[in-house]
Amino acid sequence: MMPQILVDADGCPVVDETIVLAKRYGLEVTLITDTAHVMNREGATTITVEKGSDSADFRLVNLVRKGDIIITQDYGLAAMVLSKGGHILNQNGSRYTNENIDGLLMSRHIGKKIRRAGGRTKGPSKRTKEQDDRFVYALEALIQEILQIN
């Protein structure tokens, strides 16, 4: 069975790049978004869920099949997807794996504790073309690995 690509599309800067690559390899793309981020893109199916804490995440997890590719920057969602045998990339092309997810979840927890105590943590920088290029390269490599294309 061909993998599908599921995108946690709320605030995702690489939706268009994902659709272009998926089309090249004949893969289906599904965008999962909540009502605050309604989007429709040619070449992708869009599922819109009610706005609410993690409702898009739970919908995405319910759609995941072993071997699917998921695009998200959410560590909690990534952990759930890993347990179902999915492959996860973030918007910068970094892979979330069983080997690195615990450390990522711990750093998220520490950051939350700092913010809760009144501290500040560094926010994201302005997105660059290099980040987009790195994502496209990583997604294509992952697709080729899964489809066993040399």
Where do the model's predicted regions map?
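Nuclease catalytic cores that cleave nucleic-acid phosphodiester bonds
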Residues: 2-150
